[in-house]
């Protein structure tokens, strides 16, 4: 079984806190050091026993030396600063992971900031979260049964990747691997686009002169569709900008589909409108059931 003496979590929020709790639950880490720019977050993490030691950003390079595992759980646009912060504390065998929702950009800054230590960085993206953020929402079970996507680097050794897989398995997760470019394209479609739509809908309705009436009658359908608009604006701003090209491609495809749908409604094309909705309902039901047999990728 894997075992780590010292875990350093940079960014003590929902994901970083849940990771620490999951490894504590699995009894594979002896000490957790939390590093954050927010004193309030660090105090909450100590009070909730998510971390054992709290360090400010300025104290981290010295206080966190000797770490054998480092997790970067900060917004993707803060990754460059995070890599620069941790480089001095990396031993020869320290493993570094991120939790970023975009990969090509994070890998780029890792190469720049880590230099000869880049082989110690194994990019990871846990597909888990909640619409609430902050360490108070951290949960040891957050990753149970969830996918974690690794996008290994050419510089990574097989042993480093295997150890990272073991780490996430200890958290209760399932592990899959793909290229960084494939990752960014996939999640632009199924994660980043839905978040943008939820933010846009709530913002548009809230700006209307009759917003009070609209929200007073909003019910379960609106709540379900817009749940993810409660997510961290800072995190999702960074994701949108860092995965801009892939996200714009998906937004254009969605706009085209919405225009098509508008045309069906405008022309009262009941047959095609019904067919579109039926296809959508059936595809969603198959996805929920885990029946992906009728879905095809171009390469298969």
What residues fall within each predicted segment?
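NAD(P)+-binding Rossmann beta1-loop-alpha1 motif at the extreme N-terminus of oxidoreductases
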Residues: 1-65, 69
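Residues at the starts of beta-strands that form the adenosine-phosphate
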Residues: 6, 31, 120, 147, ...
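Conserved short alpha-helix immediately C-terminal to the canonical SAM/SAH-binding motif I
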Residues: 40-41, 78, 103-106
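Rossmann-like NAD(P)-binding element
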Residues: 59-97
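Rossmann-like NAD(P)(H) cofactor-binding subdomain of soluble oxidoreductases
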Residues: 82-136
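Internal alpha-helical scaffold of NAD(P)-dependent oxidoreductase catalytic cores
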Residues: 142-227
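Interdomain hinge/lid region at the active-site interface
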Residues: 211-280
């Amino acid at each position: 079984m894997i075992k780590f003496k010292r875990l350093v979590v940079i960014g003590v929020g929902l994901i970083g806190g849940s990771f620490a709790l999951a490894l504590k639950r699995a009894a594979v880490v002896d000490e957790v050091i939390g590093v954050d720019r927010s004193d309030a977050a660090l105090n909450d993490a100590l009070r909730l026993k998510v971390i054992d030691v709290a360090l400010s950003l300025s104290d981290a390079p010295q206080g966190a030396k000797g770490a054998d595992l480092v997790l970067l759980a900060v917004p993707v646009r803060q990754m460059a600063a995070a890599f620069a912060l941790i480089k001095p504390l990396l031993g020869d065998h320290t493993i570094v992971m991120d939790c970023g929702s975009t990969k090509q950009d994070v890998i780029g800054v890792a190469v720049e900031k880590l230099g000869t230590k880049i082989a110690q960085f194994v990019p990871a993206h846990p597909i888990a979260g909640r619409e609430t953020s902050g360490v108070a929402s951290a949960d040891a079970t957050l990753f149970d049964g969830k996918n974690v996507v690794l996008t290994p680097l050419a510089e990574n050794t097989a042993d480093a990747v295997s150890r990272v897989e073991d780490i996430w398995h200890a958290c209760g997760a399932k592990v899959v691997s793909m290229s960084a470019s494939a990752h960014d394209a996939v999640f632009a479609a199924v994660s980043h686009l839905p978040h943008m739509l939820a933010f846009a809908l709530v913002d548009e309705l809230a700006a209307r002169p009759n917003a009070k009436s609209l929200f007073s009658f909003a019910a379960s359908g609106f709540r379900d569709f817009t749940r993810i608009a409660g997510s961290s604006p800072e995190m999702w701003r960074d994701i949108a900008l860092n995965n801009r090209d892939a996200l714009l491609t998906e937004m254009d495809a969605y706009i085209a589909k919405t225009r098509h749908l508008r045309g069906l409604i405008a022309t009262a094309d009941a047959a095609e409108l019904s067919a579109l909705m039926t296809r959508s309902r059936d595809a969603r039901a198959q996805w929920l059931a885990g029946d992906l047999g009728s879905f095809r990728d171009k390469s298969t």
